[in-house]
Amino acid sequence: MNDPTLLAYIEVEPGRFREDPGLRYEDYVVGHVFEHRPGRTITTTDNIWSSLLCLNQHPLHIDAVYAAETEFHQLLVSSLVTFGIVNGMTVKTISQQAVANLGWDKVRLNAPVFVGDTLYAETRIVDKRPSASRPGEGIVTVHTIGRNQNGVQVIEFDRTLLASMRHPASDPVEEVDALAGGKARS
């Protein structure tokens, strides 16, 4: 079932369309879950270059001989690589139209990731509210889970962002009041 409010294209002239991915504030529905595809297979280059770029020189991530002698018996993908790729997979839908990222919370690394693993992500909308200080924008919180090709959860985190509204209310307090059933001003 397609929701007509989740438009990925805008018609710029008759018969001509432009990609316009990403949710606006009105599109976020608490409880909805978005599966992010395609998956992303982690390569040795991803792991080593990203580890060194971030100055993470732990040999478990960049020295195959060292890693072979550990409990993992192979290079372990840096948690920053895992986080970056899983978070990046969410951008097209969750934050392509965002005004700003406000923060990440409750980051949990649930299982190791290795070169050759393919990661998939899904995001559940947890909360949303109009911004009281920034008319035309709202604050949205989401929970993202990353899984490997076997369905094993490898990472999860909460993320809060500032989202633009398609049709901003003239007074954000009025919108909050309406959402609260007329009780916000009392």
What are these regions (language model features)?
Residues 66-68, 140-160:
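Short peripheral tails and domain-boundary helices/loops at the edges of structured domains
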Residues 161-165:
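Interdomain boundary/hinge segments at the C-termini of tandem beta-sandwich modules
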Residues 2-104, 155, 166-186:
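Hot-dog-fold acyl-thioester-processing enzymes
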Residues 103-148:
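Hydrophobic beta-sheet segments that form the core/acyl-binding groove
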